[in-house]
Curated annotation (Swiss-Prot):
EC code: 2.5.1.75
Transmembrane segments: none
Name recorded for this polypeptide: tRNA dimethylallyltransferase
Alphabetical list of PANTHER family matching this protein: TRNA DIMETHYLALLYLTRANSFERASE
Species this chain originates from: Legionella pneumophila (strain Lens)
InterPro entries assigned: Dimethylallyltransferase, IPT, P-loop_NTPase
Disulfide bonds, paired cysteine numbers: none
Biological role: Catalyzes the transfer of a dimethylallyl group onto the adenine at position 37 in tRNAs that read codons beginning with uridine, leading to the formation of N6-(dimethylallyl)adenosine (i(6)A).
Top-rank EC class of the record's enzyme: transferase
Keywords in alphabetical order: ATP-binding, Magnesium, Nucleotide-binding, Transferase, tRNA processing
Catalytic activity as recorded in UniProt: adenosine(37) in tRNA + dimethylallyl diphosphate = N(6)-dimethylallyladenosine(37) in tRNA + diphosphate
SUPFAM superfamilies named in the record: P-loop containing nucleoside triphosphate hydrolases (SSF52540)
Sequence positions that bind substrate: T12, A13, S14, G15, K16, T17
Length: 313
């Protein structure tokens, strides 16, 4: 059991946080967040962080570790997560990684590729092309060269679009080829529990309800406070988090409140679609439909079965 690591993964708004907190009442888990949005301080409402009450009863590692103007990579996540896993196991507990940043899960479990270092000349060329043709043009180019990577990143994620094209221009190989190649993998047994709502309409409705709740709780005011405290720019990695970009553009007068709301909900649904695409191809994952009554009981029973079998063996 010393090398067992449980991973609770799923799309946004599928019920991961509530389930993770419940699991802590049944098993000696310690939670590690796998969420590229929750790492940021002062970004609480829009990232759907666990409540203060939830964090008191179920502490999460890797939440509130970066300022909104800082960046954080998959490589940094792997270093932090592996260090935490080792410490948790040493204490006699079991790591439970919870989140929806599938690129982090993928990097952790399959190892990181040795990618070429950034090349200023190539980056400058891509930035000039973006200025003249637009980032949509570069995203379409990436879709033709590396459709697998393009399907996994947002069309407005300029940093990742640039990096994927940079890798291709430097090596002649696609980023997806690098990421799926053989890499050194950590010495853990990962148990992947995937929340996978079968009805998209159910998930879409939850996403809309949650976005409206965020707006009611002060999401717009949260973004205004970020602008007052930090030199916030729309191209920061933190502002790629769904909802934040749309509210920034609303505050800048680019569109009205209702358009902002519609765009925020649409962006969140697109995120969920990308997360489900990752999950659909995740080999060996145990799938649970989180819209079904009693799905949490099924997961608890499966975890207990796995732990019992591990101890008996």
């Amino acid at each position: 059991m010393n090398k067992l690591v449980f991973c609770l993964m799923g799309p946004t708004a599928s019920g991961k946080t509530g389930l993770a907190c419940e699991l802590l009442t049944h098993f000696p888990f310690e939670i590690i967040s796998v969420d590229s949005a929750m790492i940021y301080r002062d970004m609480n409402i829009g990232t759907a962080k666990p409540s203060i009450h939830e964090l008191q009863s179920a502490p999460h590692y890797l939440i509130d570790i970066k300022d909104p103007v800082e960046s954080y990579s998959a490589a940094q996540f792997c270093t932090d997560a592996l260090s935490l896993c080792a410490a948790i196991i040493k204490r006699g507990n079991i790591p439970l990684l919870v989140g929806g940043t599938m690129m982090y899960f993928n990097a952790l479990q399959k190892g990181l590729a040795t990618l070429p270092e950034a090349d200023e000349a190539v980056r400058k060329r891509l930035e000039e092309e973006a200025l003249s043709q637009g980032w949509d043009f570069l995203y379409q180019k990436l879709s033709q060269l590396d459709p697998v990577t393009a399907a996994r990143i947002h069309a407005h994620d300029t940093q990742r679009i640039q990096r994927a094209l940079e890798v291709y221009y430097l090596t002649g190989s696609t980023l997806s080829t690098y990421l799926t190649g053989p890499h050194e993998q950590p010495d853990y047994c990962f148990v992947n529990l995937a929340l996978f709502p079968e009805q998209r309409s159910w998930l879409h409705e939850r996403i809309a309800q949650r976005f409206d709740a965020m707006l009611s709780e002060g999401f717009i005011e949260e973004v205004q406070q970020l602008q007052a405290k930090w030199p916030i720019q729309i191209n920061l990695p933190s502002m790629r988090c769904v909802g934040y970009r749309q509210i920034l553009e609303y505050l800048a007068g680019h569109y009205d409140y209702e358009t902002m709301r519609e765009k925020g909900i649409a962006a969140t649904r697109q995120l969920a679609k990308r997360q489900l695409t990752w999950l659909r191809h995740w080999e060996g994952a145990l799938f649970y439909d989180s819209q079904n009554v009693g799905f949490n009981t099924d997961i608890i029973a499966k975890i207990r079965e796995i732990l019992d079998n591990t101890v008996s063996n």
